[in-house]
Amino acid sequence: VVDQSADIILEHVGMTFNDQSGILETLKDIHTRIHPEEFLCVLGPSGSGKTTLLRILAGLEQPTQGSVRFPVENPHVGLVFQASNLMPWRSVMDNILLPLDLRGNNHAEALHKANELIELVGLEEFTGAWPDTLSGGMAQRVAIARALIQDPDMLLLDEPFGALDALTREKMGIELLRIWQARRKTVVMVTHSISESLLLADRVLVLSQRPAEIVLDLHVSLERPRGEAARYSRDFQVLSRRLRDAIQ
């Protein structure tokens, strides 16, 4: 019997905004569970409320209908956006340390954690580098390390590789998978890419056009570890077609 007491539960979550043109319903009756250490991808058309859903999970927005229940009070959440949002006047090391500096953590302990994460994301030779000298992929590695330094209960990623070229994006997907397998966090990632979601996720939620509802909750049955070769398997093609058909 699977213990579901540690699940994050979204109970009939809805979100309505009031703007100048009237009432805008973004999310409608989103009902699902997110399991511990699960890698969940959220797919859907542009403007379908994927980012709003992520903001609700992060505690940055309160749903206007329904509720989100966490297994712990005040969960720690790490956030990574499409823009790395690095501080240009801080080095790679100092950007990663920023969340702990703001909390006034013990510096020696913080430095030890940061060094571990720098090794994890493969930036050992760039600890003193400035953000404007980094490639897009390297900047996102720093952003992921910064999000992990507080040892969050959940990592939320909003199209983290959306601004990268196709080849770098593929490499970063494989890197993210390696990091997730090393740290085993609960991950929720918004993406527009069907193949990216199938390479990374345990499960994919497909949202409809606004107001967004879940139109498909797909368990990704592909064996792990998955590499680029997985794209060419018959199972991958079948799942890809199911996702494509579900996205309106």
Question: Model segments located where?
Answer:
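Short coil-to-helix segment of the ABC ATPase nucleotide-binding domain corresponding to the Q-loop/switch region
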Residues: 90-97
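The feature captures the beta-strand-to-loop junction immediately N-terminal to the Walker
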Residues: 43-45
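Helix-to-loop junction immediately C-terminal to a conserved catalytic motif
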Residues: 58
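Hydrophobic anchor residue at the start of the ABC signature
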Residues: 144
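Conserved ABC ATPase "signature" region
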Residues: 97, 101, 108-126, 178
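A short, proline-enriched helix->beta-strand linker immediately N-terminal to the Walker B motif
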Residues: 149-153
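Conserved ABC ATPase signature
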Residues: 130-134, 138
